[in-house]
Amino acid sequence: MKQFAHSFALAWALALSPFVAHAQVAVQANPDHEQMLASGDPRAAANKRLVYDFWREVFEGGHMELADKYMAESYIQHNPNVATGRAAFVAFFSRIAKSVPIEARVKAPLVAVVAEGDRVILCFVRTAKDPKEPTATYTTTWFDMFRIEDAKIAEHWDGAARS
C-alpha cells in the first residue's frame, strides 16, 4: 500500500509537471558591468572592453566617426539587414542612428559579457509582445557575438531576421 501511495503521488507530480515546467523565470539584467568585464585572462578582458566600448560609443551613442577605432575595415556582418564591411556598417547606421552623448555604461539591459578565445558575446534582456496575449509582454534574451582580430572587431553575428 505504501508503494502504491508513493507511485500515485509520483504519477500526480509527473502529470502536473507540464504546467509547472512552462512557468518562465523573467530574465534579469546584471547591474554590475565592471564584474562582467573582469577576467583573469588579460586578452579576454581587453576583448570584452573593446566590444563593450564599441557598443556604448558607436552603437548606442551613434558616433559613427569612432567606428574605425573599433572595427576592422574588412568587418564581416552576418546580420541579414546590414551589408559586410565597416563602410557599409557606418552607412547603414548613419541613416538610422543619431549621435547622442556617450554614456559611461551600456544602456541596454546586459545579462552577461562572455569571452572565449577571439569571441565576445553580449547577452541582453529583450522584452517582447506576447503573441498569445496582445496586452502582455515577456522577457527573453538577445545575443550579439563578435570575433576580434588584431584588437578590432572583425566579425559579428546576431539572431536578426530579414526585415
Model-based region annotation:
Residues 1-4:
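Positively charged n-region of N-terminal signal peptides that target proteins for export
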Residues 6-7, 159:
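Short amphipathic alpha-helical "recognition" segments used for binding
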Residues 7-18:
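Bacterial N-terminal signal peptides
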Residues 22-163:
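C-terminal and inter-domain tail/linker signature
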